[in-house]
Amino acid sequence: MKYFVAIIFAIIGLALPLELDAQNKELMRGYEKDLNSLFEQVFSTENKENERYNANEEVMVIMEEALLQRDSYKWKWKLRKGVSVLTSDDDKFRVITWAVVNDNNEFECFGYMQVLNENADVYEVCRLQDKTADIFNPGEVALTDQNWFGCIYTDLITTKYDGRYYYTLLGWNGGNMTTQHRVIEPVYFKRNS
């Protein structure tokens, strides 16, 4: 009977929603408030290009600091419109993306991924580096976080087949005044050896 009760408590414990402790909640609320304030500057058409990019540099620093916090993956971000936050159905990764528009109406995309390292049982943070201008045939190239066809992701589809999860990201890149790109991107993660 003791084993049965212990198993029930273990199962109930696994089913409870993951939450941050009070101290981490307060810390993450502070990051969220700071990020939303900075995103207002990043997306403001009244700001000059250099002001938007300077604010975005601050966003990058704060975002990375926030994502590197212990248990930050549990935080449910409420970021302003224009910032996409998508999480896979199996909770293996999350992607956060946004764009800065320059004075020529060209989009430069930015983003981060939090990916579960199952061996270490921690989420690793990857900064996505927009190399759209250098990628001439995106459909023929294997892309990485260091060589990313930048976009704002609008949907993350999780598919399970033969016991393994597969992911498809759908996105949009504003390009410039004459072009826009719709992006369909299959995603997989290599296991670190």
Positions of PLM-derived features:
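Bacterial Sec-dependent N-terminal signal peptides
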Residues: 1-34
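Start-of-domain marker
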Residues: 23-95
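Structural signature of eukaryotic scaffold interfaces centered on beta-propeller domains
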Residues: 79-92, 148-163
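Short beta-strand elements that form the blades of beta-propeller/WD-repeat-like
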Residues: 92-99, 165-173
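Short consensus segments that form the blades of beta-propeller domains
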Residues: 101-107, 145-146, 174-179
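Beta-propeller blade signature
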Residues: 109-118, 183-191
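Short N-terminal edge-element motif at the start of the domain
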Residues: 112-158
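Short helix-loop boundary/capping segments
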Residues: 171-193
